[in-house]
C-alpha cells in the first residue's frame, strides 16, 4: 500500500493494488453473501434473532433471500427428517454455483436429541455438503454470526470459479 497527497481531495489517499483478480472478486463475494433460511425447529427461533438488532448479520453483508436462485448459501437449522431432506436437497440444487451450507445446531449437525428416531436424518451432511457447522442446542445468535464470519473466510480463500460437489442422496429416501 502506498499513501500520497492528492491536491484535488486535500488529504491522504490510500492506494491499494491487487495483483490477482480472484482476490478482488472474493472480497466482494465475501462481503455480500445472500442467504436462504431453512429453519425446522427450535433452532429456527434462534435463527430469526440473527436479523434483530443485537446480532445483526446484515452489518457483515449477509442479506436474507426468499428464493434459492438468489442465495449464495443456505442455513439449515433444526431437526431434518427424511421427508424434509428431499426439500433441502431440492433447494440446494436450485442455488447457483458456488453455493455453501451452514448447519446450525446439534439436530442439524448430527441428529441431536432426536437422532434415535426412525424418521430423523443423522445430519444434514448426509443429504447436502456442509461447509460450516455451528454447535449448540440451540446455538446463540452470536454463534451463528461466528459461523458466518468463518464462511466469509472460506469464500475469500477459494477460487471464485470453484465448482461444488452435487447434493448426495438422502438416507432412506
UniProtKB/Swiss-Prot annotation:
GO terms for biological process: aerobic respiration; electron transport coupled proton transport. [4Fe-4S] cluster binds at residues 42-43, 107, 137. Coiled coil: none annotated. One of its GO terms (cellular component) is respiratory chain complex I. SUPFAM superfamilies: HydA/Nqo6-like. Its cofactor is [4Fe-4S] cluster. Pfam families: Oxidored_q6 (PF01058). InterPro entries: NADH_UbQ_OxRdtase-like_20kDa, NADH_UQ_OxRdtase_20Kd_su. Its main location: membrane. It catalyses: a quinone + NADH + 5 H(+)(in) = a quinol + NAD(+) + 4 H(+)(out). Transmembrane segments: none annotated. The keyword Translocase applies. Its EC number is 7.1.1.-. It is a peripheral membrane protein. The keyword Membrane applies. One of its GO terms (molecular function) is quinone binding. Belongs to the complex I 20 kDa subunit family. PANTHER family: NADH DEHYDROGENASE, NADH DEHYDROGENASE [UBIQUINONE] IRON-SULFUR PROTEIN 7, MITOCHONDRIAL. NDH-1 is composed of 14 different subunits. Subunits NuoB, C, D, E, F, and G constitute the peripheral sector of the complex. NDH-1 shuttles electrons from NADH, via FMN and iron-sulfur (Fe-S) centers, to quinones in the respiratory chain. The immediate electron acceptor for the enzyme in this species is believed to be ubiquinone. Couples the redox reaction to proton translocation (for every two electrons transferred, four hydrogen ions are translocated across the cytoplasmic membrane), and thus conserves the redox energy in a proton gradient. This is NADH-quinone oxidoreductase subunit B 1. It comes from Anaeromyxobacter sp. (strain K).
Amino acid at each position: 500500500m502506498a499513501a500520497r497527497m492528492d491536491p484535488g481531495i486535500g488529504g491522504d489517499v490510500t492506494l491499494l493494488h491487487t495483483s490477482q483478480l480472484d482476490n478482488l472478486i472474493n472480497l466482494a463475494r465475501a462481503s455480500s453473501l445472500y442467504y436462504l433460511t431453512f429453519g425446522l425447529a427450535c433452532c429456527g427461533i434462534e435463527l430469526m434473532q440473527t436479523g434483530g438488532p443485537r446480532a445483526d448479520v446484515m452489518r457483515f453483508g449477509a442479506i436474507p433471500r426468499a428464493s434459492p436462485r438468489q442465495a449464495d448459501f443456505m442455513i439449515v437449522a433444526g431437526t431434518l427428517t427424511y421427508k424434509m431432506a428431499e426439500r433441502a436437497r431440492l433447494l440446494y440444487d436450485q442455488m447457483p454455483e458456488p453455493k455453501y451450507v451452514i448447519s446450525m445446531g446439534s439436530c442439524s449437525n448430527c441428529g441431536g436429541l432426536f437422532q434415535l428416531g426412525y424418521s430423523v436424518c443423522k445430519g444434514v451432511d448426509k443429504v447436502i455438503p456442509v461447509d460450516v457447522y455451528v454447535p449448540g442446542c440451540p446455538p446463540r445468535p452470536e454463534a451463528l454470526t461466528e459461523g458466518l464470519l468463518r464462511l466469509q473466510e472460506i469464500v475469500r480463500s477459494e477460487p471464485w470459479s470453484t465448482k461444488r460437489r452435487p447434493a448426495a442422496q438422502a438416507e432412506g429416501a
